[in-house]
Amino acid sequence: MIDEAVQQLLDGFVTSVREVAAVQAVWLHGSLALGDYQLGRSDLDVIVVTSAPPPAAVADVHRRLIRDSPLARKLHCSYMTELTDQSVRHPTFAQERYFDRPVTPVTRRELAIGNRTLFGPTPAELLPATTDEELFAFVRRDLRDFWLPATRKRTNWYADIWVDLSLLTLARAHVTLATGDLITKRAALDVLPGLGAPTSVVDDIRARRYGPVPRTWPWWRHRRGVLARRFTSTAIPAVLS
């Protein structure tokens, strides 16, 4: 069940975006679709399917929602007019800015698994299926071409988001490549010890996502970043082998 405040935000978003764009469907993916949503911590991942390119006014919709509700800062939305070609970059509002990005095979598989619609037909009715080959190729490419090179840079690893995403992405990739399944972030935390991840870093991620947020001292940020970077750099080749 979706939290009442989140449901109100999503309902308001659907109403507002339908007033300015030719909306065919509005879908949920990510933690909202897979049952791992954490209020105030998780993003609100949304796809809007439109029959024509979205007008500039959709950015105004997002900015107005942000002014009215702090939760709206977490609302990330891509606007899709082309559902078949996975290489197409779609207008997206996320992190309080407007840019273009593809809807990845992982997102497409999440949409299919959750099959959650806020308006219009479900993903199963409109979205072409993502094959395991497409999913595996993307997961391998993401580890090889993005995360492995990122381990050669030191500065990013002091940020919470880099520590969290690196380890969680790695664990989820390991399971996907081994079984074809997509798992939640909560499940990924349980996988990490078996991959040799530092226990202190796993506990840190778990506390910040699911428990009382701990105070983070500068020395720990440095130590945590070193541990996360070192683990990621050695674990990726093993997962890809």
Model-derived segments and spans:
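Short, solvent-exposed polar/charged micro-motifs at secondary-structure junctions
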Residues: 35-38, 85-90, 213
